[in-house]
Amino acid sequence: MTGHEVVACGQVVAAPPGEVFRWFVDPDRLASWIGIRATLEPRPGGSFRFEIVDGEWCSGRYLEVVPGKRVVFTWGWESGAIPVPPGSSTVEVALDPHPDGTLVRLVHRDLAPEVRRLHADGWSRFLPRLAAVVAGRAPIPYPTALPEPEEAPWPSTPGP
């Protein structure tokens, strides 16, 4: 299921762009702010897979990897619990110099309307976690499970 919804958010991180870039392409660093574990091949055409919460994996392929500047990758959820199949949406991360370090600008495209809010909430929680771990602080707690179907911001069964 693809759509035309877009999520855009930003976060200032207290480190230079080259340092922040490493937190997107090193599996241990990435897992420290966005999940539990990760396997990454950060090169155009390379794959990634990471477990965000227990048993829920995201995966995709890198489209662009420009050290210290940007990372673009496809995105999706493997289990089907969230109706965004791997490869059906695209995430672009731009790293811009900022007086306080780096402005991380994230744009997630091609989301269906029913999952836009979930992804907006997720990215708006994960980017502050990134800022915290880069600064050497404990990350802000994140839920350990996805919402139950009745709490989820998408229909639990397909509509007519």
Model-predicted regions and their roles:
Residues 2, 8-9, 15, 19, ...:
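Short beta-edge strand/loop motif at the mouth of beta-sheet-based domains
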Residues 6, 81-125, 141-143:
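Beta-strand/loop substructures that line and gate deep hydrophobic ligand-binding cavities in soluble
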Residues 11, 59-64, 89-96:
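Hydrophobic/aromatic beta-strand elements that line small-molecule binding cavities or substrate pockets
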Residues 17-18, 63-69, 94-103:
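A short, structured loop/turn motif at beta-sheet edges
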Residues 20, 30, 48, 62, ...:
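Hydrophobic pocket/interface hotspot
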Residues 23-24, 65:
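Conserved catalytic core of Hanks-type protein kinase domains
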Residues 69-76:
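Short, solvent-exposed secondary-structure boundary/capping segments
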Residues 110-160:
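A conserved amphipathic terminal alpha-helix motif
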